[in-house]
Amino acid sequence: TPLWSLMQDLMM
């Protein structure tokens, strides 16, 4: 599972 996806969602 791509963690960056979640991180970017939170950053955005």
Swiss-Prot record:
Inhibition and activation profile: Inhibited by adenosine deaminase inhibitor 2-DCF, but not by adenosine deaminase 1 inhibitor EHNA.
Subunit composition and interactions: Homodimer.
Record-given protein name: Adenosine deaminase 2
Its biological purpose: Catalyzes the hydrolytic deamination of adenosine and 2-deoxyadenosine. Plays an important role in purine metabolism and in adenosine homeostasis. Modulates signaling by extracellular adenosine, and so contributes indirectly to cellular signaling events.
Recorded GO MF terms: adenosine deaminase activity
Record-stated family: Belongs to the metallo-dependent hydrolases superfamily. Adenosine and AMP deaminases family.
GO-annotated biological processes: nucleotide metabolic process
Signal peptide feature range: none
Gene designation: ADA2
Lineage of producing organism: Eukaryota, Metazoa, Chordata, Craniata, Vertebrata
Description of pH dependence: Optimum pH is 6.5.
